[in-house]
Amino acid sequence: MARVVAKSLGEVTSIITKGVAPKYVEEANENTVIVLNQKCNRDFSISLEFARLNDCREKSVPQERMLREFDVLINSTGTGTAGRVAQLFAVTEPMTIDGHMILLRPTDEIDPLYYGYAVKSHYAEIEKLAEGSTGQTEINRKRLETEIRITFPEDIQCQKKIGRLLYQIDQKIRNNKEINNNLVV
């Protein structure tokens, strides 16, 4: 049986940063990247339906803020939206996040897929980290790093098995929702 450890989110996170303040354009071209915003993060998943485009000639995006497969995204502002968590399972085009989202990437100590599920399991706690006046709440990143505890098996192969199992269950749920939506039509 694998030994299980618990560490603060900050200890198992290599990058925790907010997104960029984009310069939006309407038409895609070779100088644009997709920008995810809070509307894109719902029900623990990312939808590109409300994504916009940033003109990189006007506002460059640091390489570390370009999104990768298995990145975890948290909405950082707003009553009712701050604290929403989702994980990217595929990044097929260059994309980043705006300044109202937080990007998390794990250290090498933890499997990225497992990490996403571990962070999502703390959604209710993360949501409570929002501070500020009504309508202007924001997730406190220092508290996010120190107060959220991630529990994981030390054996990375065990982490990978758990992450894959949870992903397969989520895939079945997505497939069932799609079937149900087709039945309604």
Predicted region positions:
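Non-catalytic DNA-recognition/assembly elements of restriction-modification systems
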Residues: M1-V20, T151-V185
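Sequence-specific dsDNA recognition surfaces
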Residues: A6-E26, K39-D71
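Structural signal for hydrophobic
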Residues: L9, L36, E147-I148
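A short beta-sheet element
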Residues: N37, N54, P62-H122
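Short helix/loop capping segments that flank catalytic or ligand/cofactor-binding pockets
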Residues: F44-I46, R84, P112-L113, E127
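A short glycine-rich beta-alpha junction/loop motif
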Residues: P94-I102, S133-G163, Y167
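Short, positively charged
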Residues: D111-R143
